[in-house]
């Protein structure tokens, strides 16, 4: 038995277990298995993902992210705020900002108040139309195939006939298939999320974000995250929704995104940089004593 000190944090209800590899020797262990065990809500600590503090040659620190199923993630907008909250709390209380290395590149985080942080999320990429090729029968009334690149395309593969759903494929540090619907509450995300996540057209899997526009600067959303399932919030998903909405004329470039766990603020600035603002709360810390 090797006791591991951990920290439990959450941002807009998206929760994480954090381990500091600089403060304690982490066992030479299968990190995928460790993430699955720590994130288990009945037999572990319980979380959507695992964050690991590691040294970096490119930034102040490196953030390693593993999903609840043990898969590695490149970037997490809520996770990086929680990661930064821990660093300000326990390592660099006087820093004006922090540069954090992620799988998607170095991201800078600014502390606005004790529990509120702003992340420079980088430049989004609006990908070619989702590589989903529904049959003519599947298309139904949703539209016609052959939409040009970088525009929303009819999507009914795994969605069903008659929904009229259109999707935009956006990369904001993580790949998101963004769908706009009349009602996020009525949208069958728990059914369609895993089907789209594992669709053969996405060999690396994909996150699924569904949004309901309430106003040009306000949207309600839910996200199915690859490797974690339905979560209370998703930072890269909020960014992807704003990019897709602005790109298709539904939204302005500064938007409040209401997710089940709270509100995230996204700005897509004129220089093409995405900014994500939201809370990050250190909930508790403890020692995990389970046998590895």
Predicted regions located by residue number:
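A glycine-rich beta-to-alpha transition motif near the start of alpha/beta enzyme domains, typified by
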Residues: 1-114, 132-133, 178-292
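Intrinsically disordered, low-complexity regions enriched in acidic/Ser/Thr/Pro/Gln residues
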Residues: 117-119
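Ligand-binding beta-strand-loop-alpha-helix segment within the catalytic cores
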Residues: 125
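Ser/Thr/Pro/Gly-rich low-complexity, intrinsically disordered segments
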Residues: 132-140, 154-156
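Glycine-biased, low-complexity coil/linker segments
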Residues: 139-142, 160-162
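Low-complexity, intrinsically disordered or signal/transmembrane-proximal segments
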Residues: 144-145, 157
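Selected transmembrane alpha-helices and immediately adjacent juxtamembrane segments
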Residues: 166-167, 175-178
């Amino acid at each position: 038995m090797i006791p591991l000190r951990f920290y439990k944090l959450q941002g807009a209800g998206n929760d994480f277990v954090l381990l500091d590899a600089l403060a304690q020797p982490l066992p030479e262990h299968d990190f995928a298995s460790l993430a699955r065990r720590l994130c288990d809500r009945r037999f572990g600590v319980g979380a959507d993902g695992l964050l690991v503090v590691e040294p970096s040659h490119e930034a102040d620190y490196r953030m390693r992210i593993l999903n609840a199923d043990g898969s590695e993630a490149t970037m997490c907008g809520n996770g990086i705020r929680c990661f930064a909250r821990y660093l300000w709390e326990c390592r660099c209380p006087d820093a004006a900002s922090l540069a954090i290395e992620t799988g998607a590149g170095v991201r800078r985080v600014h502390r606005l108040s004790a529990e509120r942080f702003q992340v420079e999320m980088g430049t989004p990429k609006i990908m070619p139309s989702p590589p989903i090729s529904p049959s003519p029968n599947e298309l139904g009334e949703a539209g016609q195939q052959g939409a040009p690149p970088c525009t929303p395309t009819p999507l009914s593969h795994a969605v069903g006939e008659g929904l009229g759903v259109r999707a935009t494929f956006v990369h904001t540090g993580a790949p998101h298939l963004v769908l706009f619907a009349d009602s996020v509450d009525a949208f069958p995300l728990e059914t369609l999320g895993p089907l789209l996540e594992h669709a053969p057209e996405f060999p690396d899997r994909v996150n699924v974000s569904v949004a309901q526009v309430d106003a040009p600067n306000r949207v309600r959303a839910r996200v199915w995250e690859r490797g974690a399932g339905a979560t209370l919030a998703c930072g890269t998903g909020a960014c992807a929704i704003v990019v897709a909405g602005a790109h298709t004329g539904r939204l302005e470039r500064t938007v409040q995104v209401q997710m089940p766990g709270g509100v995230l603020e996204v700005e897509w600035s004129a220089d093409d940089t995405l900014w994500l603002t939201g809370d990050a709360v250190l909930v508790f810390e403890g020692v995990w004593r389970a046998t590895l």
